[in-house]
Amino acid sequence: MDIWKFYDIRHRGLLLCNPMNEEKLERLCRLFRLERGTRALDIACGKGECLVRLAELYGITGVGVNISPYCIKDCLEKKRARVPEADIRFIEMDGAKYEPEHGESFDLTMCVGASWVFGGHRGSLRALSKITRPEGLIAVGEPFWLLDPSEEYLKTEGIRKEEFGTHSDNVKVGEEEGLVCLYTLVSNHDDWDHYETYQWWAVDDYVRTHPDDPDNLELLEKTRVGKESYLRWGRDTVGWAIYIFRKSQKA
C-alpha cells in the first residue's frame, strides 16, 4: 500500500497531523509575535494549517514543503479558501532536499513531528539552523520517553530506544547546538487520544465507503497493530512536545 495514501486515509478529518490540539496551535502562533512580511519555512508541513494561520495573523510570506501529494493538495485548497492572496508557496518534494535561494534567509523555520526527514532531532535542528537567520526562531515537534520502553513495544513499532530521548534531553540537544530554548508545548493524554483514536474512526469510515479497495486488508491490519501498540504501551510510554528555540548570533 502506498505510504502516503495510508497516511492520508488515517488523517482525513484531522486539522493537525500530530498530537496537538487547535487551542495550543493558536497559542503557539500568537506567541511567535511575528512582523508582517516575516519569512517562514515549514518542512513536512502537513496540511498547511500553521503557515495559513500565520498568514492570517501576521501576513507572513512562506514556503511549505511536503513529500506527500495528498498533503500538498490539501495545502493548496486551504490556501485558496482562506488566504488566496498570501505569498505562500507549497512544494511537493523531500524536505531534506529543499534548498532556499539564499542561506540564512528565514526568520522562522519549522519541522513539527517529522525529524526523520533529517535523521533525528539533532539533525533536524542542525538543518534548520543553517537556513535560519541569526536571532531567528526554530520550531520542532519531537517525541520523548515518559518511561523506558519495553522491548515488545520497540519491536512492534520498529524503532530503537536511542532514537528518542527524554523531554529534558530534547531541550539539551538544542542547547548543545548553540540554540536557546524559549518555550515548550507538551501534549497531554487527551491530545494523544484524539490524534490516535480519530485515525481508527477514519479507517473504519474509509473501509465502509470503499469496500472494493484492494488495500483494505492491509489498512485494517496496520490499524489493528497500531491500536494495540498504543493502548498497551504507547499511551503511557511516549510523550510529545513542540520546542521553540532562538538561533543565537554565534550558532
List each language-model region with its residue ranges:
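Conserved alpha-helix/loop element of class I SAM-dependent methyltransferases that forms part
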Residues: 18-36
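Class I SAM-dependent methyltransferase SAM/SAH-binding core
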Residues: 41, 49-97
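A short acidic, Gly/Pro-enriched loop at the edge of an enzyme's catalytic core
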Residues: 100-109
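A short SAM/SAH-binding and catalytic strip from SAM-dependent methyltransferases
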Residues: 108-120
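A short glycine-rich, Lys/Arg-flanked "PGG" loop and its adjoining helix->strand segment in the class I
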Residues: 122-137
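Short, glycine-/aromatic-enriched active-site segment of Class I SAM-dependent methyltransferases
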Residues: 140-161
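Short alpha-helix
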Residues: 163-178
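Conserved Class I S-adenosyl-L-methionine
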Residues: 185-251
